[in-house]
Amino acid sequence: MSEPLDLNQLAQKIKQWGLELGFQQVGITDTDLSESEPKLQAWLDKQYHGEMDWMARHGMLRARPHELLPGTLRVISVRMNYLPATSAFAKKIKNPKLGYVSRYALGRDYHKLLRNRLKKLGEMIQQHCVSLNFR
C-alpha cells in the first residue's frame, strides 16, 4: 500500500521543479476564480485583448478551469522573464544607429519555450503522482 500524498510537500516540490526549469515564480491556487471573473469580463469589454480574438471567444474559460478540463483541482501558474539579467540590452538601446524590436519577438517563440517547459513540469508531476493529469 502506498503512502497518502502530502499535498503541501507536493506543492513545494512543484515550485522547486518550476524554478529548476527556469521559471522565476510558480504559484498554485484552487479553481474557484469567481472573484476574478468580473475583472476579466471588464478587461475583455474594454478590448484590452487587442487582436487576440480567441480571448474574446474563450476568455471566460480562464476564469472557469473546471470547464476547460473537467475534474481540475488546482491551477499552476508560472512566470518567466523575457529579458535575462545577463542581457546586454541596456547598452544596445543607447546606440542611435540601431532599431529596436520587443524582447519577446527576438529569438525563439516564447509560446514554444513556455509550452516545452510546462510539459516538462507536467511530466515531473506525473512521475511523482501517476494518478494526476495535466494540460
Question: What is each model feature region?
Answer:
Residues 1-135:
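Auxiliary alpha/beta "docking" domains used to position bulky ligands
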